[in-house]
Swiss-Prot record:
This is tRNA 2-selenouridine synthase. The active site is at 97 (s-selanylcysteine intermediate). One of its GO terms (molecular function) is tRNA 2-selenouridine synthase activity. Belongs to the SelU family. The gene is selU. GO terms for biological process: tRNA wobble uridine modification. The keyword Metal-binding does not apply.
Amino acid sequence: MQERHTEQDYRALLIADTPIIDVRAPIEFEQGAMPAAINLPLMDNDERASVGTCYKQQGSDAALALGHKLVAGEIRQQRMYAWRAACLQNPQGILCCARGGQRSHIVQRWLHEAGIDYPLVEGGYKALRQTAIQATIELAQKPIVLIGGCTGSGKTLLVQQQPNGVDLEGLARHRGSAFGRTLQPQLSQASFENLLAAEMLKTDARQDLRLWVLEDESRMIGSNHLPECLRERMTQAAIAVVEDPFEIRLERLNEEYFLRMHHDFTHAYGDEQGWQEYCEYLHHGLSAIKRRLGLQRYNELAAQLDTALTTQLTTGSTDGHLAWLVPLLKEYYDPMYRYQLEKKAEKVVFRGEWAEVAVWVKAQ
């Protein structure tokens, strides 16, 4: 790849999930990175801070000299080993630093001296980030159909099954409710936006996309918020509402929040610690809405949750959770969603059970 990139080149990198060897410091990477990037820094956080201070006090030549002094000898050898291995594992990859400046050029030169020619992103992460932002703004202008419905309606699955669907909750690593956390930590806001842009670009590139199918989300999904350009378009979008029987919703919630989460926690942490993490996850979710439930109702539901967990631990049955889940849905989640839906009733264009909504969406 040439080192003078056009806008199309940057978009192509995101669409192809091109491996990116990001040589920025870890603190920069954590604040925002591209989806296919791995962080193999030229300088660690402390080294970067020292060079930055030197640059401000003594200028660029002194800072460059300090950088070479800090990244020398065994440290340089260790980092070269990691870069070489990454290049060999990702022959179609590309180097990236903050702005396509000295850091990526230095690593590129060192690799060349070691017999590896590897391209870099001219303009660096900043250019890719601006491309992601602009792509989201442009792609959000296409028509949108939102999938709505009460908790447990299978909205996310319906979106996932559409070729023009984008699973916002999956990208955010959060299901959007008090019980919405997953075992994967949420990304930084910038990384979430970059991932969303890449997913929209890939989805758009696979087909002659006429409209987006998205879940009816609020502005916040856990700690991530939707880009304003997309959120604004979603407030104007048509809504198809899934209205499944209450019992079907309970089955889905039992599978998703009790059976699957228990499995995921024990798979990640082992039986004993996994069980403790699972119990803490459910209690934390209930505690998050304590103020809205009121102390008395919260205490009642928390006691029922404890009883259900004891039953699940001793018998393996999750049926006991219905004692607190049913009133939580009927007294809190369902009224809250219906109230929110009433405020945008004029946007609702279709209602039906899950299969009916799926057929309707595919016909659009």
